Amino acid sequence: MLTQQSISLLKSVEKISPDFFYFTSTSLLYRAALENVNHAKTKSVRNFFINLKNEKMIQDLNELNEVFSLIEQAPLSDTISEYSAVVIDNYIKRLLLACGDSLCLISCSKQLIEQKNITSIVSQLTKAYEILDEKDTQTLATILANLLVHLDTRKKISINSSILSGFTELDSITQGFKKSDLIILAGRPSMGKTAFAINITRYVINQKRSYVILFSLEMSTEQLLRRILAQECNLNGQKIQSGQLNNDEWQYVIQKSKTLANLNLYIDDSAKISTDTIKTKVKFFKLQGKNIELIIIDYLQLLQESRQSDNRSQELSLITRSLKILAKDLSLPILALSQLNRNLETRSDKRPLLSDLRESGCISKFNYLQTSLYNQLQILFNCYYKKIEVINFSAQKQQLFLAIKCSISKTGKKTVYKIITEAGKYIQLTSNHKLLTTQGWKRCDKINQNDMIAIQIKNFEEQKNVFNSFSSLTFESIQKINVTSLQIVFDLECKPLCNFISNNFIVHNSIEQDADLVIMLYRESYYTQETRSRDFTEVIIAKHRNGPTGTFQLKFNAQIAKFSDA
């Protein structure tokens, strides 16, 4: 049972990060103490000192005496919250002093002011603001009470607080974009992703009378405005671009331009923008009192990540994770446009799949899939282009489940890694496939011999397609990792948990896991000259975390790049 003092101590610890301390030595000691509290099996002072010694933080007797001296000076647990408040207050003051120093340096410098300098200062100020605005963890009773009040309010006013797109079928399936949702809009080039986003932008601004922020990394503000004008005036985009308009058309453009000038639309066409910069700009915009309803990013692959990665696919994973965190932090839906990889061009059926969102990880044809408690099927002989049921893992419920049918498709030849555990179990898969480890999902090319890999064991009982994972999973160390050769590999698409068991390993099937909603655009006339479907675009709801998926059609006017209900 946790005492009131223990709860107070835990709350204080949660609020303080190691970098809040001024002295590096104190920061390192606090980090070691956190490791002892959060990860050690036995929480003790002895383990704390063992960690210090292992990390080479204590070299001699004098340093050991210094640590003992700090422990003797430690405040009583009933005053810990006051001391933690002092630590936080001093850290914020140091942040503000650093901002002041930076402002003085920039102001006195003879060089031209660069945007990155201002962004850095605003970022530090935002960080200070967020620390002061930190929300405490709420009890389940409080959350439920707030939820019931919210539901009762919605019932009375009968208005959906979600952001509607203006497309009847899309809104029917999704019930609108929810706050903190990350929505991915994907398609091959020229499918109309930007036009689709502009359609939604115009509708949201008209309905909500709120701001939409559009970060355009591909087009300039002028190019985007020409597209918006074409949609607004129902005029051929080429005519507007060339300026070949008759008098009536020209007067109409001027009239519509006056309307557009008052739109609550903010366009940022900065190049090489990062998720951190987007966060800073949006928060700065909100501090000005602007009511923002939606953020649009065009497009995902052109975003930069502050933490550079050796692998672009890994970097995109970091970006999507950052965008999801940002959407939750801002309590705003983020619509991110995305390209699909060109592998789908080699398929006979070019209708996009979730695995086309990025270079999908694949497994060797010689691997086996766990399809039930005792049955395994080798991909090469049993699974080619078939749909089969497989066992997958729910991290939320900590259980293994018999999944719905998993689709398998051949993706050609790729270089394959072979990972072998100390117990002799092995699996062959491509570099960007993920495996479950003690540290969560890790890509094959990021796994090393210090990692522990999740392995399925056979001493569990099957009950209604659910297995108790505490007796069915173990973690094994890695003996070696080899790069083998080019092999025929296969891609698997498993819903809803996006993973499966192969050769007893828990394998992620590389589907974009951070998005709440994935919308894909497909137009048959892009690949064929079939006139019957030229004016129609298929909209595929490929993933919907909070509801059903589905497919419907929209009319697409290529002349003015505008979508409308079919």
Curated annotation (Swiss-Prot):
Naturally occurring in which organism (per UniProt): Pyropia yezoensis (Susabi-nori)
Primary gene name: dnaB
Chief localization: plastid
InterPro entries xrefs: DNA_heli_DnaB-like_N_sf, DNA_helicase_DnaB, DNA_helicase_DnaB-like_C, DNA_helicase_N/primase_C, Hint_dom_C, Hint_dom_sf, Intein_C, P-loop_NTPase
Family the entry assigns: Belongs to the helicase family. DnaB subfamily.
A matching Pfam family: Intein_splicing
EC numbers: 5.6.2.3, 3.1.-.-
PTM: This protein undergoes a protein self splicing that involves a post-translational excision of the intervening region (intein) followed by peptide ligation.
PROSITE patterns: INTEIN_C_TER, SF4_HELICASE
Membrane-spanning segments: none
Domain SF4 helicase, chain residue ranges per copy: 156-426, 308-566
Keyword flag Zinc: no
Role of this protein: A replicative DNA helicase, it participates in initiation and elongation during chromosome replication. Travels ahead of the DNA replisome, separating dsDNA into templates for DNA synthesis. A processive ATP-dependent 5'-3' DNA helicase it has DNA-dependent ATPase activity. The intein is an endonuclease.
Record keywords, A-Z: ATP-binding, Autocatalytic cleavage, Chloroplast, DNA replication, DNA-binding, Helicase, Hydrolase, Isomerase, Nucleotide-binding, Plastid, Primosome, Protein splicing, Repeat
CC terms in the record's Gene Ontology section: chloroplast; cytosol
Quaternary structure and partners: Homohexamer.
Gene3D superfamilies: DNAb Helicase, Chain A (1.10.860.10), Hedgehog/Intein (Hint) domain (2.170.16.10), P-loop containing nucleotide triphosphate hydrolases (3.40.50.300)
Subcellular localization(s) per the UniProt record: Plastid, Chloroplast
Binding positions (ATP): G187, R188, P189, S190, M191, G192, K193, T194
GO biological process: DNA replication, synthesis of primer
The keyword Repeat belongs to this UniProt entry's keyword annotation: yes
Catalytic reactions on record: Couples ATP hydrolysis with the unwinding of duplex DNA at the replication fork by translocating in the 5'-3' direction. This creates two antiparallel DNA single strands (ssDNA). The leading ssDNA polymer is the template for DNA polymerase III holoenzyme which synthesizes a continuous strand; ATP + H2O = ADP + phosphate + H(+)
Protein name (record): Probable replicative DNA helicase
